[in-house]
């Protein structure tokens, strides 16, 4: 029996396949040395998934590729900053064997972040913080300056609601992130010729750059 599914269910399945294939490609290209996570949205659910993966299945990897492409925003820049800015200060040892590094609830190894033209709102702010705090390199294409926060308003018809930008984010130099385009450290375009072949040039570039960083350290 063939049971039809909704368009949203189809999109969810395609997304999961894309993430799985991206993770498999990173494992293949790095020889198992790197892990891969995609931040689907700047929200609690996505954060829990990323947290679980980097400190769980990828705990023994030498570094992590953080993918923020196609992320529509939310509010997670502070959490991502804290999570990926860990600096090792102790190693727990049990009976002569290393158990874990500390801090044990933050990521202490090298990382790299991929971004793209479809990043929006906090998916602009998060890569900005990542670069501003010198946490790692940015790979991909420039992200439009869309980092604002909105106030959600509902009209008399509750099915009609919209967000009004009311919060700007100003740097110490007095520049607002809104309308300030963010440029990657490594500019790589996913050409349509390679996209239709299933090739992700931005992902490949991120793996190459992170491995070079690890090998030179």
Residue ranges and their predicted role:
Residues 119-121, 156-187:
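Metal-dependent DNA phosphodiester-chemistry modules and their immediately adjacent helices/loops
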Residues 1-157, 194-202, 208-215:
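Cleft-lining beta-strand/loop regions that shape enzyme active-site pockets
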């Amino acid at each position: 029996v063939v049971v039809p599914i909704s368009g949203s269910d189809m999109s969810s399945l395609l997304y999961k396949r894309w993430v799985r294939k991206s993770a498999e490609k990173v494992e293949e290209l790095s020889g198992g040395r790197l892990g891969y996570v995609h931040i689907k949205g700047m929200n609690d659910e996505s954060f829990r998934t990323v947290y679980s993966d980097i400190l769980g299945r990828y705990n023994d990897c030498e570094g992590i590729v953080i993918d923020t492409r196609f992320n529509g925003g939310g509010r997670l820049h502070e959490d991502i900053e804290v999570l990926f800015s860990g600096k090792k200060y102790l190693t727990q040892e049990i009976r002569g064997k290393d158990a874990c590094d500390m801090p044990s609830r933050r990521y202490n190894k090298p990382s790299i972040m991929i971004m793209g033209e479809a990043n929006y709102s906090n998916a602009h702010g998060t890569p900005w913080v990542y670069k501003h705090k010198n946490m790692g390199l940015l790979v991909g294409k420039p992200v439009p300056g869309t980092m604002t926060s909105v106030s959600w308003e509902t009209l008399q018809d509750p099915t009609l609601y919209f967000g009004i930008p009311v919060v700007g984010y100003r740097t110490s130099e007095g520049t607002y992130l809104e309308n300030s385009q963010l440029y990657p450290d490594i500019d790589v375009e996913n050409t349509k010729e390679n996209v239709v072949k299933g090739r992700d040039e931005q992902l490949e570039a991120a793996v190459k750059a992170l491995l070079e960083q690890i090998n030179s350290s």
